[in-house]
A protein has these predicted regions:
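Short acidic-hydrophobic, aromatic-tinged amphipathic segments that line or gate anion-handling sites
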Residues: 76-81, 144-151
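Acidic, metal-associated active-site segment
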Residues: 106-126
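Short beta-strand scaffold positions
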Residues: 44, 79, 109, 130-131
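Short, well-structured N-terminal submotif of metal-dependent ribonuclease cores
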Residues: 1-44, 54-70
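Acidic catalytic patch
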Residues: 74-103
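Short loop/helix-cap segments at secondary-structure boundaries that form the rim of catalytic
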Residues: 136-142
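A generic structural signal for short hydrophobic patches within well-formed alpha-helices
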Residues: 13, 49-52, 85, 136
Length: 152
């Protein structure tokens, strides 16, 4: 039996890899622990790792980088693939053809890459945990991380 799969978008991944003990960071870390304890399979997509990692590197936040590395090793990690990137290109083009782009034309669109990574798993019980459902929910199931419950 396949359990529910939750992919972490950059928002929640950034919260759980932030060593600062803010209320939101601690709440997100506790939420992640509850998911794991209930049997939810939590995955770090490579595009989300990239988005969080580049900012941690820019700001020279070594403790955050260490936490991010630990998470990437402790959880399942979904590397980018040629198939996912080609699907992302199709999603990007389709969004523009329908007059609803998800990012400006000259940026790498992390949302469509994340959506394509999620689609590449080809499973029915999957959701992306995010802090901004908007663009993602056009392509794949996405919810605010605060609304995703552990398995019962």
């Amino acid at each position: 039996m396949v359990s529910r799969i939750v992919l972490l978008d950059a928002g929640p991944l950034g919260l759980v890899s932030n060593p600062k003990p803010s209320q939101q960071n601690l709440a997100c870390a506790a939420w992640l622990q509850r998911l794991l304890e209930s049997g939810v399979r939590v995955i770090v997509p490579e595009i989300a790792d990239y988005e969080v990692r580049r900012e941690l590197l820019r700001a020279n936040k070594q403790p955050g980088l260490m936490l991010l590395d630990t998470l990437a090793e402790a959880l399942d990690y979904l590397p980018l693939s040629t198939a996912a990137m080609r699907q992302a290109a199709r999603l990007w083009a389709s969004a523009r053809q329908s007059g609803q782009p998800t990012a400006s034309d000259n940026t790498i669109d992390g949302d469509v890459i994340l959506a394509a990574q999620a689609q590449s798993l080809d499973v029915s019980d999957l959701v992306i945990a995010t802090t901004n459902v908007g663009h993602l929910s056009r392509f794949v199931p996405a919810q605010l991380w605060t609304e995703i419950e552990p398995l019962t």
